Amino acid sequence: MKVLKWGLLAAVLIQLIPYGHTHTNPPVTQEPAWDSPATRELIHRACYDCHSNQTVWPWYANVAPMSWLLQRDVNGGRSHLNFTEWDKPQRHAKDVDDEVTKGDMPPWFYLPMHPAARLSAEEKQALIDGATKSLGPQGAQEPSRRASVQPVSK
């Protein structure tokens, strides 16, 4: 009984730690010029919660320690590749096909709570093909060579 009381007290107290409670979605500045609506839909479904400024924060994003993990993952995802800040250099855009092929993205721990992000083999291949067409074979380009960039319409 004593352990339960201390455990409950600890669970309540960690909610007071401020990290992970401020969930922001900065403005969308630009997206890539997607080769098709299907590519955009697949990337939205499987990638946008961590790799965009359009994160859908689930209810458990407000409960520590899950809030800490989610905040860390979204911050890391956005810093590595952000599909909604395409006006800035995205040095990891060239890695999309490799990460999806290896099964590293979307990560295994994301899928149980986000079943829509689970892609079939055909969908993975369509995402890879569409991303290669949309982002180019080199992935990210220098800002001066980003002719395929389009502003986001609201």
Please annotate each region the language model reported:
Residues 3-154:
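Aromatic- and Gly/Pro-enriched helix-to-coil junctions and flexible linker segments
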